[in-house]
């Protein structure tokens, strides 16, 4: 019996929930290319034990962040292999953050969305500081579908990047549901529930697209992915 085994008794040695690591969406025009980036500190936070070679297009690199151009080491993913646990469906919980208060979370979107109207009434003609923030909980997995870190990561998005990400993920799920129905000889394709969706492997390849109604700007979005078919269905689990 190892000395470590004593700590498995959580009634004596309780555990705590720590802050989760984040996958950053690289979408600014000056970036080398769009995709997801895992900072080294977030790799440590999630218990990373993978390697860039576990993924179709990934490598170790240095990226700059913030107005001071701080450099961060990490891993870049052009085509991350994702298992999405929660947050990427359009009806999943989102939050309202206040950009004037250092991105402080004001509350759940469906509970505090009146803040937008109140701002328009009190500050006519001024841009709203409120943004709808989406957090997508996920795992990065190897080619066998095994997570390469011990704790889940989250992807934080807002605006067009969030909207398009959800649309493309929903499109992928619908393709997979159709392929599943063919593979199982079901008469009709039915939508997957939460638990089934949380077991699916999605491998999007990110690219840049112009987004905006009046003034367009580049955003990083999933542009393509492995299309599910009756023959390839098993590779998505």
Q: What do the PLM-derived regions correspond to, one by one?
A:
Residues 1-153, 189, 215-219, 227-229:
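OB-fold ssDNA-binding interfaces and closely related basic DNA-contact patches used
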Residues 132-227:
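Extended serine/threonine-enriched, polar tracts that run as long, contiguous segments within proteins
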Residues 230-237:
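Extended, charge-rich, solvent-exposed interface segments
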């Amino acid at each position: 019996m190892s000395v470590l085994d004593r700590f498995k008794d959580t009634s004596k040695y309780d555990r705590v929930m720590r802050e989760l690591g984040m996958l950053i969406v690289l979408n600014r025009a000056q970036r080398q290319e769009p995709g997801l980036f895992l900072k080294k500190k977030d790799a440590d936070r999630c218990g990373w034990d993978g390697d860039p070679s576990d993924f179709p297009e990934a490598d170790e690199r240095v990226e700059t962040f913030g107005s001071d151009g701080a450099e961060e080491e990490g891993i870049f993913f052009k085509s991350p292999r994702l298992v999405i646990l929660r947050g990427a469906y359009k009806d999943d919980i989102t939050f309202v953050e206040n950009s004037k208060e250092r991105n402080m979370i004001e509350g759940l979107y469906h509970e505090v969305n009146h803040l937008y109207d109140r701002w328009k009434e009190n500050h006519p003609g001024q841009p709203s500081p409120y943004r709808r923030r989406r957090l997508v909980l996920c795992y990065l997995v190897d080619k066998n579908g095994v997570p390469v870190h011990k704790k889940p990561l989250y992807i934080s998005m807002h605006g067009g990047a969030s909207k398009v990400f959800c649309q493309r993920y929903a499109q992928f799920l619908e393709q997979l549901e159709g392929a599943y129905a063919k593979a199982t000889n079901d008469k009709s394709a039915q939508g997957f529930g939460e638990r089934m969706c949380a077991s699916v492997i999605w491998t999007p390849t990110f690219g840049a697209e112009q987004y905006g109604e009046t003034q367009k700007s580049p955003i990083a979005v999933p542009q393509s992915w492995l299309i599910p078919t009756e023959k390839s269905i098993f590779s998505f689990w």
